[in-house]
Amino acid sequence: MQPSGHRLRDVEHHPLLAENDNYDSSSSSSSEADVADRVWFIRDGCGMICAVMTWLLVAYADFVVTFVMLLPSKDFWYSVVNGVIFNCLAVLALSSHLRTMLTDPGAVPKGNATKEYMESLQLKPGEVIYKCPKCCCIKPERAHHCSICKRCIRKMDHHCPWVNNCVGEKNQRFFVLFTMYIALSSVHALILCGFQFISCVRGQWTECSDFSPPITVILLIFLCLEGLLFFTFTAVMFGTQIHSICNDETEIERLKSEKPTWERRLRWEGMKSVFGGPPSLLWMNPFVGFRFRRLPTRPRKGGPEFSV
């Protein structure tokens, strides 16, 4: 085997390692099953603070839009239509954020680099596999080790503290939706702020809001700054993610300028692979694939067993 000090892209990887890492180690199998039964969550202090801040900032924007701009408006349909649109975008954004944060990004099972498993691969002379010394696993093609998640992640793009998770093979779709819905809601909030300022300047400041004029101005200015910051950040991230998907190249691979040893997908094939299936409105739905886990209930003495 090659020394584990650095990763070589020009080595030949065993084809079995690109699949689901099925191996015969009983201890590793039980460990993988335990991970599958638990909700994926990274216990990182900085990431959890950033995730909570994301929700608080969205809640602040929703408060200003609803209670400062829309409810005091005399135009009923203007308030209803814009309120429904903004709150739908906010719900979709936060749902996408949760799915990104709580979805396994494609972690490689720990401890599968056992002697028995390596012997079962039946490697040919000259074939090379790569073992991660940190989590004691055999790295599949295009997997990278995350020092925060402490796992090797398939097709790892980057670790994002705002979602407290890595963006990888299994949750990249939700991250793309999160950036898109945050960008759209930011644009909508900025447009509403513009209309609100025009309405207040043309009329009376005391009539355009239930709050005092100084408080109204401060709330609107903070919302404008938040909207500009969020839109700039998420629009750039959305563009880079779509570019990476279409080029079948993660951000880590692009920064390292690594020569691809894999067959790159066509642009639409990459999009269909990430979003699951041909183009449809389901691409925009963060709830697709969401399932409640069946939890066994504790049986009563002498009674039958039930599941909910």
From Swiss-Prot:
One annotated Gene Ontology cellular component of this protein: endoplasmic reticulum
Domain notes: The DHHC domain is required for palmitoyltransferase activity.
Functional description taken from the UniProt entry: Golgi-localized palmitoyltransferase that catalyzes the addition of palmitate onto various protein substrates and therefore functions in several unrelated biological processes. Has no stringent fatty acid selectivity and in addition to palmitate can also transfer onto target proteins myristate from tetradecanoyl-CoA and stearate from octadecanoyl-CoA. Palmitoylates sex steroid hormone receptors, including ESR1, PGR and AR, thereby regulating their targeting to the plasma membrane and their function in rapid intracellular signaling upon binding of sex hormones.
Post-translational modification: Autopalmitoylated.
Lumenal side: 72-75, 195-217
Residues passing through the membrane, by range: 51-71, 76-96, 174-194, 218-238
Assembly information from the UniProt record: Homooligomers. Heterooligomers with ZDHHC3.
Superkingdom of source: Eukaryota
Membrane topology, record value: Multi-pass membrane protein
Gene Ontology biological process terms in this record: androgen receptor signaling pathway; glucose import in response to insulin stimulus; negative regulation of catabolic process; peptidyl-L-cysteine S-palmitoylation; polarized epithelial cell differentiation; positive regulation of D-glucose transmembrane transport; progesterone receptor signaling pathway; protein localization to plasma membrane
Name of the protein described by the UniProt record: Palmitoyltransferase ZDHHC7
